[in-house]
Amino acid sequence: MCPGGKAPRKQLATKAARKNAIVVGAVKKPHRFRPGTVALREIRRYQKSTDLLLRKLPFQRLVREIAQDVKQDLRFQSAAIQALQEASEYFLVGLFEDTNLCAIHAKRVTIMPKDMQLARRIRGERN
């Protein structure tokens, strides 16, 4: 016991030493963003961009597959495939925008098939 009547103070480890002791013992968790943060970042990125979103070769195969039903051995210029892809993506982006508005109208943030069906029905599309 000390002459003043108090017990001697314990030495506290420095902040850096404590941090190192914790890090050495455990594996650091990877950083995770809150749900929706990455999605919003992707939405902003794709809204800024003007490039095509669908891969060219899979789209070209799809066009050729559909064209087979109309006529055998059809040939396409690359500019024709590109024009079809531009028009298709323009249509799909607009449809998804309308679908999102239908989901928001229903007080939801997640789009569902019924939202897309409603959007197409309002637009007057069939099938």
Swiss-Prot record:
Residue(s) carrying N6-acetyllysine: K6, K15
Modified how: Acetylation is generally linked to gene activation.
Modified residues (N6-methylated lysine): K19, K28, K71
Record-annotated membrane-spanning stretches: none
GO molecular function, one term: protein heterodimerization activity
Coiled coil: none
Domain of life: Eukaryota
Annotated keywords: Acetylation, Chromosome, DNA-binding, Methylation, Nucleosome core, Nucleus
Family: Belongs to the histone H3 family.
Entries under PANTHER family matching the protein: HISTONE H3
Name of the molecule in the record: Putative histone H3.3-like type 3
Taxonomic path: Eukaryota, Metazoa, Ecdysozoa, Nematoda, Chromadorea
Underlying gene: his-69
